[in-house]
């Protein structure tokens, strides 16, 4: 993988953890993007000195522009969904890590692949909604698709020798069960959004935490696994409250 990274969705949970890795290993950060978290983005710009920054929210773009006005060596700013796509396609972008939340990530994923960039993918919706588009584009352009989601990354690492990849039959995706695991129907009555946001193992963004509590996230991960590893959607799921178990392949 290139040691030059362009990080889409840099201010979210996965984005900030990815920058921890860049900091630890000295990776060059070519570009960053965010939706509206200007203060976090300003701190990241000050530390990592990206050449380009894309901001999709119009008001946040204006706020960031004003904050950077007159600064020497300020990054070039790109605006809106078009700016996000442009950032993903740039020469010199290196490996594009897509940690954008939601369907907005699909266009950026395809843009990066079609521009010849390896794609480290944390955006579930790219494969859930456009799996055939993404996998076809990867094959056509001869790039690497690297899963970032912990379960899929665990499987990917298990399959790095040719024998394992050729003989894969089943994938087991683990599920913590979220904050409501083991509760009876009666115990679930009256639970609130605030309760659902109390994940027992991880501090994540609100959307993925709610998806975890309802097990919707695990359904998305099953679809992802089917596209990533070429298996029918009958992968087995099992519940493991321990965060140490991520995935198992057979």
Question: Predicted regions span which residues?
Answer:
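Rossmann-like NAD(P)H-binding beta-loop-alpha module
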Residues: 106, 111-115, 131-196
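ADP-ribose/adenylate-binding Rossmann-like module
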Residues: 117-128
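Mid-domain beta-loop-alpha active-site segment that forms a flexible
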Residues: 149-154, 200-229
């Amino acid at each position: 993988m290139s040691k030059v990274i362009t990080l889409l969705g840099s201010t979210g949970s996965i984005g900030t953890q990815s920058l921890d890795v860049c900091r630890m290993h000295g990776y060059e950060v070519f570009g960053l993007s965010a939706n509206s978290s200007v203060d976090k983005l300003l701190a990241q710009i000050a530390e990592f000195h990206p050449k380009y920054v894309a901001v999709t929210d119009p008001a946040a773009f204006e706020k960031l522009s004003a904050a950077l006005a007159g600064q020497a060596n300020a990054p070039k700013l790109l605006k809106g969904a078009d700016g996000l796509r442009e950032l993903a396609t740039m020469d010199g972008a290196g490996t594009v890590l897509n940690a954008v939340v939601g369907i907005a990530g699909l266009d950026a994923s395809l843009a990066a692949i079609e521009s010849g960039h390896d794609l480290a993918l944390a955006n579930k919706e790219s494969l859930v909604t456009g799996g055939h588009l993404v996998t076809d584009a990867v094959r056509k352009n001869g790039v690497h698709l690297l899963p970032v989601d912990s379960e899929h990354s665990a499987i990917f690492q298990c399959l790095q020798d040719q024998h394992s990849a050729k003989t894969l039959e089943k994938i087991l995706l683990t599920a913590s069960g979220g904050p409501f695991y083991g509760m009876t129907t009666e115990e679930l009555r009256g639970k609130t959004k605030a309760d659902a946001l109390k994940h027992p193992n991880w501090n994540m963004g609100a959307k993925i935490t709610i998806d975890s509590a309802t097990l919707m996230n695990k359904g998305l991960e099953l679809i992802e696994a089917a596209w990533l590893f070429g298996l029918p959607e009958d992968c087995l799921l099992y519940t493991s409250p321990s965060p140490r178990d991520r995935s198992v392949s057979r």
